[in-house]
Amino acid sequence: MAKFDAKSFNERAFGKYMSAIPNVKLNKLKESRAIVADQRLRETFVNNGQTGTVYAVLPYFGLIGGDAQNYDGVSNLTPEKTDTFEQGVFTYGRMMGWTEADFSYDVTGGVDFMANVRNQINRYWNDRDQDTILSILKGIFAMASTGTGNVKTANAAFVSAHTYDISAPSTDAVTTDAMKVSATTLNSAIQQACGDNKQKFSLVICHSTVATNLENMKLIAYLKYTDAEGVERDLGMATWNGRLVLIDDSMPVEVKNVGSTGGDVSLYTTYILGEGAIGFEPVGAKVPYEMVRDAKTRGGEDTLISRKRNAVSVAGISYLKTSQATNSPTNAELENGKNWSLVSNGTDCIAHKAIPIARIISRG
């Protein structure tokens, strides 16, 4: 893979070249087990032989339960039935193209240009997938009024119980330490959301302002990795109370005027995910990479085009596809609460405490 050249470009070889480098950041996310492979997605969107499938409704089995009955050699057993719910899952596609001039050269020298291209493309798609996951989470916490009857009530209960708000958004007061994350905030938030299931939480996604606040209190430790050239680099991730922390300045920040005393304050959202919260499965594009030449522009230029398709499921939550214009939802459509609901059987929903997803709202 020596040249950025449409004439000599081999899409299959380049695809193998792209997958040959370890994706350190994605691997760390998978280690947290908050973002996991979902075999149901692969069976539905890859292995079933039906091309063009972009959305599916899958059975979602409830947990067994009921009170144990007395085994005395006399009493008859009355078995319980496990409810079967339905869950909407979906795929999304994204594409982008770059010319050779779009890629920055490694000024330290000694690095093959196409290796640099590969690294930059990997980082680009990591960031875009991260943006999509954040849009999904934003949509989930906007579903309080989705549905009718028991379903609407359950959706509102999820949003309320899984939101730990210490920002005092209606209080006309200057920001105090009590309105910012502290040593006890994380534990309190996950306990409120899931009770004795709180140990399932394994990943925190927060704004750098929140991370800096935690760093100043010596509550987080940053992770590093060694690249292929043996250089130690920042991974842009940390740990907090043994949970992986992903730092992302595209996290929601709302600027709100709380009154004449407090003035404008910034309200930061921090997401917390548990094991299996997001099922994420690359399902492939027909032509994932190709290079085209435009002979008439600026004396001729080559453009590298990259396409991705991923399938997504969210634990205990169904994507409804209520408001989606094309086969692939945009991030704005994923942020629409009307597209999300707790998994249900049409009448009743699963218990929201089984869903390892929560958020903290704070002033820093």
Over which residues does each language-model region extend?
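Protruding loop/beta-arch "assembly-hinge" segments enriched in small, turn-prone residues
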Residues: 1-22, 271-274, 282-364
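Short, low-complexity, charged/polar segments at coil/turn and helix-coil boundaries
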Residues: 27-54, 60-68, 138, 168, ...
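Short, cationic low-complexity segments
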Residues: 83, 225-243, 326-346
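N-terminal "assembly arms/tails" that initiate or stabilize quaternary assembly
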Residues: 1-89, 246, 279, 339-364
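Long, contiguous amphipathic alpha-helices that act as assembly "spine/axial" helices in icosahedral shell
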Residues: 58, 85-153, 194-210, 295-316
